[in-house]
Amino acid sequence: MLKTIALDAMGGDNGPKVIVPAALSILKKHPKVKLILVGKEDQLALLIPEKNRKSFGQRLEIIHASEEVGMDEPPSQALRTKKNSSMRVAINLVKEGQAHACVSAGNTGALMATARYVLKTLPGIDRPAIIAAFPTKNEREVRVLDLGANVDSTPENLYQFAVMGSILSSAAHNIRNPRIGLLNVGEEEIKGNELVKKANELFETRKTINYIGYVEGNTIFNNIADVVVCDGFVGNAVLKASEGVAQLIKQHAKEAFSEAWWTKLALLPAIPILKRLIRRVDPERYNGATFLGLNGIVVKSHGSANIKAFVCAVEEAIFQVDKNIPQLIKEEVAHILKEFENK
C-alpha cells in the first residue's frame, strides 16, 4: 500500500521552485510513497519534466487550489477567507482520508489554526504542540516540545505534551521508556516559575512517564533526556537560539576556509572533522516539526527551507505514517484515562 503525502506546494518563501524538486527527489528515494502536489496547477505542471511524469505515473498527482496563504497573513483571516488555499486543501485531503499526512512550509499560525479546525485534537488532548528533533552529543536525537503552538500553557497541558513526546520518541528510537525532562532555570526543586513547579508535581505524581526531573537549557543537547517539555514561549526561544548557533558555526567554518592559502593548507587535516561537525548541527537535517496531538499528521517545514531541508520534512511525515503516531497517542491516552478512572 502506498503512503500518500499531501504537499502544500505554494507554501513557504520559495514555494513550488523548492517543493516540486523536493517532491521528485522523494519519489525517487521512496518507491512506496505517493505525493499529491496541491497548488496552482499550471505553475506546478511547468516544473515537472515529462520524463518524471511518465516514470512516477500515479505516484505523483496535482490537485488544483486557486488560493495561497501569505506568510504574514493573520491566521484567523486565512482560516475564514482562504477555504480554497493550497494549505487548506492539503489538510482537507488528510481529513477525507485521501492522504495520510500533510507537509507545509507555509505560515505557521495559519497552518496550526487550519489543522486544528479541520482535523480536531485527539480524544483526551486539550491542545496540540509543536515538536522537533535536535542533535545531541551522541547519535540519538532529543525531541523538544512545545516549540510555539501555545504561548500560555497549564500544568495539565505540559503533562499531555510529555505523554505525546514520549510516544513519538519511543517510536523514533525503539526505546520502551524515553527519559522525559522538564525545562527549567535550574535543577533544584525551589527554582522555576509557578507553571513549572506545578507541572513538576504533576509529573512526579502520575507514574505514566519516565520522568527524570528538571533539565536546564545548557544540558538539552547532552543526551540527559530523550524528550524535553516546556511551554511554547520558552520552546520557540530555544528553537530560534539553536538555529542561530548552528548557522554561526557553519558561517565560521566557511570563513576559515576562505582565508589565505596557508590558512587553508593548515586546516586541511581538519576538513573531515569539520564536515562531520557541520553535518551534526545542520538545521536542514532536522527540518520538519510536527503538530502533535491532532487527529492526523501535519508536519511544518521551515519557511525558508531549501530542497534538501524540505525532503527531510517529508521524510518525517513518512516516518510518522509508518508508525501511525496519532493512533499510538490515541491508544496511550485512552489507557491513561482509564487508569485514572479506576483509581
From Swiss-Prot:
Localization per Swiss-Prot or TrEMBL: Cytoplasm
Gene Ontology cellular component annotations, sorted alphabetically: cytoplasm
An individual GO BP term: fatty acid biosynthetic process
Single GO term (MF): phosphate:acyl-[acyl carrier protein] acyltransferase activity
InterPro entries, per database record: FA_synthesis, Phospholipid_synth_PlsX-like
Domain of life where this protein originates: Bacteria
Enzyme class at the top of the EC tree: transferase
EC code(s) of this entry: 2.3.1.274
Main location: cytoplasm
Pfam families: FA_synthesis (PF02504)
Keywords, ordered alphabetically: Cytoplasm, Lipid biosynthesis, Lipid metabolism, Phospholipid biosynthesis, Phospholipid metabolism, Transferase
SUPFAM superfamilies reported for this sequence: Isocitrate/Isopropylmalate dehydrogenase-like
Pathway field: Lipid metabolism; phospholipid metabolism
Catalytic activity: a fatty acyl-[ACP] + phosphate = an acyl phosphate + holo-[ACP]
Oligomer and partners: Homodimer. Probably interacts with PlsY.
PANTHER family per the UniProt record, alphabetical: FATTY ACID/PHOSPHOLIPID SYNTHESIS PROTEIN PLSX, PHOSPHATE ACYLTRANSFERASE
Function text: Catalyzes the reversible formation of acyl-phosphate (acyl-PO(4)) from acyl-[acyl-carrier-protein] (acyl-ACP). This enzyme utilizes acyl-ACP as fatty acyl donor, but not acyl-CoA.
Family: Belongs to the PlsX family.
Name of the featured protein: Phosphate acyltransferase
Source species: Coxiella burnetii (strain RSA 493 / Nine Mile phase I)
Name of the coding gene: plsX
